Amino acid sequence: MEETSVAGDPGPDAGTSTAPNAAPEPVARRQRILFVGEAATLAHVVRPFVLARSLDPSRYEVHFACDPRFNKLLGPLPFPHHPIHTVPSEEVLLKIAQGRLFYNTRTLRKYIAADRKILNEIAPDVVVGDNRLSLSVSARLAGIPYIAIANAYWSPQARRRFPLPDVPWTRFFGVRPVSILYRLYRPLIFALYCLPLNWLRRKHGLSSLGWDLCRIFTDGDYTLYADVPELVPTYNLPANHRYLGPVLWSPDVKPPTWWHSLPTDRPIIYATLGSSGGKNLLQVVLNALADLPVTVIAATAGRNHLKNVPANAFVADYLPGEAAAARSAVVLCNGGSPTTQQALAAGVPVIGLPSNMDQHLNMEALERAGAGVLLRTERLNTEGVAAAVKQVLSGAEFRQAARRLAEAFGPDFAGFPQHIESALRLVC
């Protein structure tokens, strides 16, 4: 009599052993992923934090390394945290403001030693770093695939110019004459910034990355850009360079008491200068908006140096940034990508007050896309800020451009975990 199988029953000849002593199938080992954030600024910590949190813990054993200075803002970490040295934020920001080399050979040598220690202890399958330039050496020496997180405007293949940042010389001599000298000497300045990492790479038997600062900031076995091509276009990207999309994060803070009772009869301006904005600029902004028919909600990022808070302004140390941007008509910030991406994701235009090169590059991309206005900070005054706010509030084209970028952001951010997992599979 012929034997038959019912649905779901493979039958006696399916090749599956039912012997009691059959060895169980081996359980696939979870890949061990180490994320490293460079805590010079908050942005370079929260991006790897969001990435790490997005991965499926049943598939990945996640470890997170950073200086703990921002841990209180991150809240409870759902994975092991490993403290790692980062130079004080104030020191880095001061050097950037002065136009000085912010990572010298001695600093990077210490970073490499700290990296190698933690890489040896954790033995990850992959290391993901955000602005931790030393991983260009330490990960290669350890033979561990290295994924670099960066912004697309630092890509060697990006379509952009290099604007003059806010440096002491522009304050003393003015932007125009310094711009002429800057255009002449910028390649030399960038080459000097490349020296420390290239020297250490050669010392450890690795090839030089050359004299293009963009290669220093984007070096990795695999590089992910936290941008979209609609905002920062590139050309002829290498196969191991991919757009990731925006990495959005807001602190999990309790809204202030005034959050639910704001006036609704006037447009809201969300003002925040983040952890790297000028200390006195927020006061200039609040003074500029004091006599306008707007409501201002402002976050000081824990750096409250305000001497006067106008009647139309509501201030807190920290605000839920995505929610604040979503209820605003304009976001006014330091031009850095974390806050501008929150604004654009909500379809809200931006007024940026950039100081360093990173912020200038980001804001110039927004201006080219029609979704923002850049104000230089050297001689910033209340009249200029007020005029820019009036311009953006009255110009429908700014809102339309911001909404177009919000549509571009959508699919990239929705596929965020898949982007990461695809990258991990490609480098493993």
Swiss-Prot record:
SUPFAM superfamilies in the record: UDP-Glycosyltransferase/glycogen phosphorylase
Annotated EC: 2.4.1.-
One of the GO biological process terms: glycolipid biosynthetic process
Keyword Glycosyltransferase among record annotations: yes
GO cellular-component term (any): plasma membrane
Keywords of the record: Glycosyltransferase, Transferase
Residue segments, region Disordered: 1-23
Gene Ontology MF term list: hexosyltransferase activity; UDP-glycosyltransferase activity
Top-rank EC class of the record's enzyme: transferase
Domain of life: Bacteria
Function: Involved in glycosylation steps downstream of mono-O-methyl-glycosyl-p-hydroxybenzoic acid derivative (p-HBAD I) and 2-O-methyl-rhamnosyl-phenolphthiocerol dimycocerosate (mycoside B) during the p-hydroxybenzoic acid derivatives (p-HBAD) and glycosylated phenolphthiocerol dimycocerosates (PGL) biosynthesis.
Family listed: Belongs to the UDP-glycosyltransferase family.
Name this polypeptide is given: PGL/p-HBAD biosynthesis glycosyltransferase Rv2958c
Organism name: Mycobacterium tuberculosis (strain ATCC 25618 / H37Rv)
